[in-house]
From Swiss-Prot:
<comment type="subunit">
    <text>Homohexamer; trimer of homodimers.</text>
</comment>
<dbReference type="GO" id="GO:0005829">
    <property type="term" value="C:cytosol"/>
</dbReference>
<feature type="binding site" description="in other chain">
    <location>
        <position position="20"/>
    </location>
    <ligand>
        <name>phosphate</name>
    </ligand>
</feature>
<comment type="function">
    <text>Catalyzes the reversible phosphorolytic breakdown of the N-glycosidic bond in the beta-(deoxy)ribonucleoside molecules, with the formation of the corresponding free purine bases and pentose-1-phosphate.</text>
</comment>
<feature type="active site" description="Proton donor">
    <location>
        <position position="204"/>
    </location>
</feature>
<feature type="binding site" description="in other chain">
    <location>
        <position position="24"/>
    </location>
    <ligand>
        <name>phosphate</name>
    </ligand>
</feature>
<protein>
    <recommendedName>
        <fullName>Purine nucleoside phosphorylase DeoD-type</fullName>
        <ecNumber>2.4.2.1</ecNumber>
    </recommendedName>
</protein>
<dbReference type="InterPro" id="IPR035994">
    <property type="entry name" value="Nucleoside_phosphorylase_sf"/>
</dbReference>
<feature type="binding site" description="in other chain">
    <location>
        <begin position="87"/>
        <end position="90"/>
    </location>
    <ligand>
        <name>phosphate</name>
    </ligand>
</feature>
<dbReference type="Pfam" id="PF01048">
    <property type="entry name" value="PNP_UDP_1"/>
</dbReference>
<comment type="similarity">
    <text>Belongs to the PNP/UDP phosphorylase family.</text>
</comment>
<dbReference type="GO" id="GO:0006152">
    <property type="term" value="P:purine nucleoside catabolic process"/>
</dbReference>
<dbReference type="GO" id="GO:0004731">
    <property type="term" value="F:purine-nucleoside phosphorylase activity"/>
</dbReference>
<feature type="site" description="Important for catalytic activity">
    <location>
        <position position="218"/>
    </location>
</feature>
<feature type="binding site">
    <location>
        <position position="43"/>
    </location>
    <ligand>
        <name>phosphate</name>
    </ligand>
</feature>
<dbReference type="InterPro" id="IPR000845">
    <property type="entry name" value="Nucleoside_phosphorylase_d"/>
</dbReference>
<feature type="binding site">
    <location>
        <position position="4"/>
    </location>
    <ligand>
        <name>a purine D-ribonucleoside</name>
    </ligand>
</feature>
Length: 237
């Protein structure tokens, strides 16, 4: 048992999906896993372990933002021995070529957060995905016929920014989307020598708000992302 997770040793698989929304974790467990057992309800941050196509996997919510995912991911890695972590979440498109319901695989994550600069104030430490996971996820998504973009994302500390033009300028530099967790997850993976990847479904298009999705759609309809994440988790077994 850790401070924020009530599971016992052995309750959590060594590979896990990490949606931000705990209700999305519940949805994944109920709709994709067999024999799913809930291992955590602390702070309503639901976590489950079950099997997917005969492979033992877990899924757990992380909440919103880098401080929150840093708490849960670190405890999963350090206290429970998780070796492979895939974030499955939503993002807002800033690249004009990226649209709602398409996937973005975060090859790297820029950030405006100080969560990494607290450790390395004198330079920018690049946050990158595990290439093996990235490669597998890309080919799995392509085989499924899912429109998928690979590239940089911005992990932001701010959802409601007062300077949206600064974020939009990044789209002109090839940054695909804005989200709030990947950079912290990648930094933890680098520290602890484990594998991590961010798979995002575009829920909002900052270039065209008419494409935006509802809260219910974000919770229950982004199943392509969930399938790609699960298939990627078991691809090494």
């Amino acid at each position: 048992m850790s401070i924020h997770i009530s599971a016992k040793k052995g309750d959590i698989a060594d590979k896990i999906l990490l949606p931000g929304d705990p209700l999305r974790a519940k949805f994944i467990a109920e709709n994709f896993l067999e024999d799913a057992v809930c291992f955590n309800e602390v702070r309503n941050m639901f976590g489950y372990t079950g099997t997917y196509k005969g492979h033992r996997v877990s899924v757990m919510g992380t909440g919103m933002g880098m401080p929150s995912i840093s708490i849960y991911a670190r405890e999963l890695i350090v206290d429970y021995g998780v070796k492979t972590l895939i974030r499955v979440g939503t993002a807002g498109a800033i690249d004009p070529e990226v649209h709602v319901r398409e996937l973005v695989l975060a090859q790297a994550a820029a950030t405006n957060s100080n969560i990494i600069r607290n450790d390395f104030p004198e330079f920018d430490f690049p946050q990158i995905a595990d290439f093996g996971l990235l490669d597998k996820a890309y080919h799995i998504a392509r085989e499924m016929g899912v429109t998928t973009h690979v590239g940089n994302v911005l992990s932001s500390d701010v959802f409601y920014t007062n300077m949206p033009e600064r974020n939009m300028a990044l789209g002109k530099l090839g940054v695909k989307a804005i989200e709030m967790e990947a950079a912290a997850l990648y930094y933890l993976a680098a520290q602890h020598h484990v594998k991590a990847l961010g798979i995002m479904t575009i829920s909002d298009n900052l270039n065209d708000p008419t494409e935006d999705t509802t809260a219910e759609e974000r919770q229950t309809t982004f199943t392509d992302m969930m399938k790609v994440g699960l298939e990627t988790l078991i691809a090494n077994d």
